[in-house]
Amino acid sequence: MDQTPVAEELRVVVAQLVRRFRQDREIPQPQFNVLSTLMRRGPITTSQLAALEGVRPQSMAHTVAQLLTAGLVERHSDPADGRQMLIEISASGRTSMVEFRRTADAWVNDAISTRLDAEERKTLKAGIDLMRRLVDE
C-alpha cells in the first residue's frame, strides 16, 4: 500500500509545528542550532561545530562571533591543547535556551489540554511513539 499521502501530510504537519515553535524564539536559526549543540555536547571547537552543523568553518566563525557579541557563548583555551579555543554556552545562553523550551512546552501543553479530549491525548501519545520509531536508528 502506497504511504505517499500519509508521508506528505506528516511532513507538512511537522513543518507547521516547527514553524509554530520558531515563532516564540528571538534567536536566529543558525545561532539556535549552535546553542542547542553546545547544550547537548558541551564545549567544542568552531571547526567541530561547523562539521556537526554541516556548514563551512567561515560561516560558523561568523555565527560564533554573533553569539559571542550577544553574550550567549564564551571562548576558552582548550586545556588539552592550548592552541585551540573551545566554544561553550554561557549562563545567559543557557537561560535563553531553557526559557525558550519552557515557553514552547507551555504552548504545547496548553494546546493539548484545551484542544484534545482524553482519548485524543492517548492517540497523540501513541502517534508520538510511532514517530519516534520512524527517526530512531
Segments predicted by a language model, with ranges:
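Short amphipathic alpha-helical/adjacent loop interface patches that line ligand
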Residues: 14, 53, 97, 128
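C-terminal regulatory/oligomerization modules of transcriptional regulators
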Residues: 1-7, 118-137
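Charged, amphipathic alpha-helical coiled-coil/dimerization segments
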Residues: 65-123, 136
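Short, leucine/isoleucine-rich alpha-helical interaction segments at C-terminal helix-coil junctions
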Residues: 17-20, 24, 70, 115, ...
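DNA-binding alpha-helical recognition surfaces that contact promoter or target DNA
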Residues: 62
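N-terminal helix-turn-helix DNA-binding core of bacterial DNA-binding proteins
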Residues: 18-59, 70, 86
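N-terminal leader segment of winged-helix/HTH proteins
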Residues: 1-32, 133
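Pre-recognition alpha-helix immediately N-terminal to the DNA-recognition helix
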Residues: 12-16, 33-39, 95, 122
